[in-house]
Amino acid sequence: MGSTHEHVDLLVYINGEPLDLNQSRYAMKSSYGHIHGGEGDIMHLHAINIPLSWFMETLDLAITPTSINVHGFEYVTNDDNVLMVVINGNAIGDMDQMLIDEDKILIYYGPGDEDDLNRAHSLIPDRAQEINSMPNKGD
């Protein structure tokens, strides 16, 4: 596996609230790709060709095109709520999409109405580019 040092902005938004990825349960799960403690909005990638599904599984947040499992509770697309994964403004259906430096990822579960989606989009962090410009890329 080749090495790299890249960063991706991440927001997991469930039922109107961002999931708090700053908790220690999410920090440093793998040396290939991880979240640093206290920086739950940034994915740190140290290997190439990391799929979104693999990264989410390392956080115990297994994801499919229609569901996300958050610590044993499965949020499934139904008549009232929808799971959407949006990368750089485009909805995707392939959870094995490879992560790319400075991607902006929204994992959304909720009613899917315009107001809620707009709120979620407004909360997507914008830090990956800033971290990439730091000495040692923030590590």
Language-model segments: which ranges?
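Ubiquitin-like/PB1-type beta-grasp interaction modules and other compact soluble beta-rich domains
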Residues: 1-139
